[in-house]
UniProtKB/Swiss-Prot annotation:
Protein name listed in UniProt: S-adenosylmethionine decarboxylase proenzyme
Record gene name: speD
Residues recorded as bearing Pyruvic acid (Ser) in the entry: S113
One Pfam family in the UniProt entry: AdoMet_dc
Active site: S113, H118, C141
Recorded superkingdom: Bacteria
Source species taxonomy: Bacteria, Pseudomonadati, Pseudomonadota, Gammaproteobacteria, Lysobacterales
Top EC category: lyase
Catalytic activity entry: S-adenosyl-L-methionine + H(+) = S-adenosyl 3-(methylsulfanyl)propylamine + CO2
Necessary cofactors: pyruvate
C-alpha cells in the first residue's frame, strides 16, 4: 500500500511523474535445437499480444487509471509489444457525447501516462539455455501510483529474476507556492512487495534517496532443477548431466542478475 504524505492543497494539477520499470526473466534448459524452438513457440503463444493486453488492462484497473487507447503487435519470428495510454480522468465516449471532445486534462496526460510491455524470447546457440525477457514500464502523472501493480506483475509472469527501477520526477506546487518533489513515503521498492514474494526471493537494493531513484533486483531463493527443464524431468538424467545443466542454469541466472558475464 502506498502511504501518502499528509494531504496537500495543490495549486492546479499534481505534476509529479512516477515511473516504474521492470525487466523480468524466465530461464529454461532445452537439450536439443528442436526443444529450444518449441520453448520459443510456447512462450510466444503464452505471452502473445492478446495475453499481454489483458495483463496491462488489469494493471490499469489496479492502479485506478482510465484507458485512452491500446496499440498491440505480435512480431515475426517472435515477440510482442503492447502500449496503453492512460489517464486519471474518466474518458468521454465520443459515440455517446456526439461532437464533445475529450477534456484537456486527458489530452495532457497522453504523452506522460502509459503502460508498455515488450517481450524478447531467445536461445543460446550451443549450450541449451533459453530465456524469456519481458520489459514493462508503467509511467503515471498525478496521484496515480504504479507501485500498486508491483505484486500483480511479478505473479503474472514467470519471474525467475526481476530487476525493478522506480523514480519520481518533476514537482507539484501547493497553494502557498511551496514545491513538493515527492508525495508519498518510500525508502525501498521492497516496502510495496507482498510477504509471499519477499519469502521466495533474494533481494538487493541500490537507492539514491536524494534523487528519488529506487532500484531493487531479486531472484528466486530455491533452485529446483525440474522447474527449469523444458519437456524433461531431472530423474531421467544422469548425475553428471544434472550437475552440468544445473551449473549452466545457475551461471545464467547469476549473469542476468548481475548484468554482466562472469565466466570469462
Amino acid at each position: 500500500m502506498v502511504k501518502p504524505l499528509p494531504r496537500l492543497r495543490l495549486q492546479g494539477f499534481n505534476n509529479l511523474t512516477k515511473a516504474l520499470s521492470f525487466n523480468i526473466y524466465d530461464v529454461c534448459y532445452a537439450r536439443t535445437e528442436e526443444e529450444r524452438q518449441r520453448y520459443i513457440d510456447y512462450i510466444d503463444e503464452r505471452y502473445d499480444a492478446d495475453r499481454l493486453t489483458q495483463i496491462l488492462t488489469d494493471v490499469a484497473e489496479i492502479i485506478g487509471a482510465n484507458i485512452l487507447n491500446i496499440a498491440r503487435q505480435d512480431y515475426d519470428p517472435q515477440g510482442a509489444s503492447v502500449t496503453i495510454l492512460i489517464s486519471e480522468e474518466p474518458v468521454i465516449d465520443k459515440k455517446q457525447a456526439g461532437k464533445e471532445l475529450i477534456s484537456d486534462a486527458v489530452v495532457a496526460h497522453m504523452d506522460k501516462s502509459h503502460i508498455t510491455v515488450h517481450t524478447y524470447p531467445e536461445t543460446h546457440p550451443q549450450e541449451g539455455i533459453a530465456t524469456f525477457r519481458a520489459d514493462i514500464d508503467v509511467a503515471t502523472c498525478g496521484v496515480i501510483s504504479p507501485l500498486k501493480a508491483l505484486n500483480y506483475l511479478i505473479e503474472s509472469l514467470e519471474s525467475d529474476i526481476v530487476i525493478m527501477d522506480y523514480r519520481v520526477r518533476g514537482f507539484t506546487r501547493d497553494v502557498k507556492g511551496k514545491k513538493h518533489f515527492i508525495d508519498h513515503k518510500i525508502n525501498s521498492i521492497q516496502n510495496f512487495l507482498s510477504k509471499s514474494i519477499k519469502s521466495r526471493y533474494e533481494m538487493f537494493d541500490v537507492n539514491v534517496y536524494q534523487e528519488n531513484i529506487f532500484h531493487t533486483k531479486m531472484h528466486l531463493k530455491d533452485f529446483d532443477l525440474d522447474q527449469y527443464l523444458f519437456e524433461e524431468k531431472a530423474r531421467n538424467l544422469s548425475f553428471k548431466e544434472r550437475m552440468k545443466i544445473e551449473a549452466l542454469l545457475k551461471l545464467e541466472i547469476e549473469e542476468l542478475f548481475h548484468g554482466r558475464n562472469l565466466a570469462e
